[in-house]
A protein has these predicted regions:
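ATP-binding pocket architecture of kinase catalytic cores
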Residues: 38-209, 219-224
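Conserved protein kinase catalytic-loop anchor
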Residues: 227-229, 247
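Helical subdomain adjoining the active site within ATP-dependent kinase catalytic cores
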Residues: 305, 309, 320-363
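Catalytic-loop of the protein kinase fold
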Residues: 229-231, 236
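Active-site activation/catalytic loop segments of kinase-like enzymes and analogous catalytic loops
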Residues: 262-303, 317-335
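Catalytic activation segment of kinase domains across protein kinase-like and atypical kinase folds
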Residues: 240-266
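Juxta-kinase regulatory segment immediately upstream of eukaryotic protein kinase catalytic domains
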Residues: 2-34
Length: 363
């Protein structure tokens, strides 16, 4: 999940996790040693990642990454972390599509060994567009690339989304449908309303977020379109690249059964979030990169499906991101890193953009 300046992310110590991981692994691969344990600098604020190597003559994996459900003591971003669900999604995507998804190896549902459920997968080698500071800022490899190189990365990245939506059998994703009544999109939005209610439980609600939900109803698509497997957190910050070629598609915890445009709207808006933030700090950013019109046009060319109701779907993406940002801000306050202002809308970094979307003046 994309964020602003990085707050505290965990109460766990990598060395202790490595020791406990070694004890757990010995039960599956007797005599195996866990070495080179580290936490990536881009470790997220939802599930955590631990990198390590396995030394054993018969190990199925040597360079590994472990995804561990969030530590409840760290004031979690989401109310639940379903590691078996993520593990299942990644295995299915690998089975049904040609997307470069890391091989998933072991799933541990018992929280005993490491304090929370986790799974182990192959570690991908390469580089990831940074979130902090965002790739739209000066001083990173993607910003320093040529227009042609960024164009190649953009083309390869939108192709990932197109291939996922086209190749994955939609019926195999129905297990991701939230409980309740109504269409997949109705259920998806209802789940976000429930998440928002959880975020503000006992705390100040956000008038802006509530206006955005009301605006969604006004813009609701007349034809929602068929549901497909959505990646969920569909953005280039969750892709490992070799040069400018994708070699691993990561972070499937937000995977969903929803219309194609839910993924596409997220991809469009999450880039705009970084671009707007960069411009607000006096830098030009990357104004010709990942533009909405270019992504929509190319997606239509690749899939034969013309994206529709994108005002709705980009607003929905900005709204969903706002709920996460509000939770992260309340989380920072919990750790004593920020003060909570009288107006909670001020805690949402992109409140001006979201307000413009609600008013219909952003695009």
């Amino acid at each position: 999940m994309a964020t602003a300046p990085r707050p505290r992310t965990s109460t766990r110590e990598p060395e202790e996790l490595g020791r406990r991981l070694g004890a757990w692994l010995d039960g599956r691969l007797p005599g195996a040693k866990v070495t080179n344990v580290s936490v990536p600098g881009s470790n997220g604020m939802s599930s955590e990642t631990l990198l390590f190597d396995i030394e054993h003559p018969d190990t199925p994996l040597r360079a590994c990454a472990l995804r561990l459900a969030a530590d409840p003591a760290a004031y979690t971003v989401f109310p639940t972390y379903d590691m078996p669900r993520q593990h299942r999604v990644m295995g299915l995507v690998a089975a049904y599509t040609d997307l470069p998804v890391p091989r998933v190896q072991w799933l541990e549902e018992d929280p005993g060994p490491l304090g929370a459920p986790f799974f182990v997968m192959a570690r991908a080698e390469g580089r990831v567009p940074p979130d902090v500071m965002p790739y739209t800022y000066e001083g990173n490899w993607l910003h320093a690339a040529t227009d042609a190189e960024r164009g190649a990365l953009q083309e390869a990245s939108i192709s990932l989304l197109a291939r996922l939506h086209d190749q994955f059998p939609a019926g195999e994703a129905e297990f991701l449908l939230p409980e309740g009544e109504g269409s997949p999109l109705r259920r998806h939005v209802a789940a976000q309303r429930a998440y928002y209610a959880w975020v503000v439980g006992g705390l100040a609600p956000s008038p802006l977020i509530e206006r955005a939900f009301a605006r969604l109803e006004e813009l609701w698509p007349a034809d929602e379109g068929p549901a497909v497997l959505n990646w969920g957190d569909a953005r280039i910050g969750n892709v490992v690249y070799d040069g400018f070629t994708p070699v691993a598609v990561l972070d499937w915890e937000m995977a969903a059964y929803a219309p194609r445009e839910v993924d596409l709207g997220w991809s469009v808006y999450l880039h705009r979030f970084f671009q707007d933030l960069t411009v607000s700090f006096g830098q030009p950013g990357l104004p010709d990169f990942l533009r909405r019109e270019d992504l929509e046009r190319r997606y239509a060319e690749l899939t034969g499906h013309t994206p529709r109701d994108m005002e709705f779907h980009t607003l929905y993406a900005a709204l969903r991101h706002a709920i996460v940002m509000l939770r992260i801000a309340y989380r920072q306050a919990h750790f004593g890193e920020v003060e909570v202002p009288a107006d909670p809308d001020g805690l949402i970094l992109h409140h001006a953009s979201l307000a413009a979307m609600v008013q219909g003046t952003y695009w």
